[in-house]
């Protein structure tokens, strides 16, 4: 998983209505099982105790390991979703990710 950096990477997503929303990268990880990289995003400016929908995508990292909105791919396989949710739950259970 990527390290928590002082500088948070942000990505703009466009919904079906054409509205733009700014998201912060929560973390990224690579799955050897699927040989893919994943990125998890949260809306910008959320409070620590606020409940949010976390967005997850497959992405192809650039030379710096970063992602852009043009490179995000929907996850469509149920087993793949289960794996991503498992990684997310492990991340959320580790309090050190939020210090």
UniProtKB/Swiss-Prot annotation:
Q: Which Pfam families match?
A: DUF1292 (PF06949)
The record's listing under InterPro entries reads: UPF0473
Q: Which NCBIfam families match?
A: PRK13678.1-4
The record's PANTHER family line, in alphabetical order, gives: UPF0473 PROTEIN CBO2561/CLC_2432, UPF0473 PROTEIN CBO2561_CLC_2432
Q: Which family does it belong to?
A: Belongs to the UPF0473 family.
Cross-referenced HAMAP family: UPF0473 (MF_01448)
| Entry protein name | UPF0473 protein LEUM_0559
Q: What is the lineage of its organism?
A: Bacteria, Bacillati, Bacillota, Bacilli, Lactobacillales
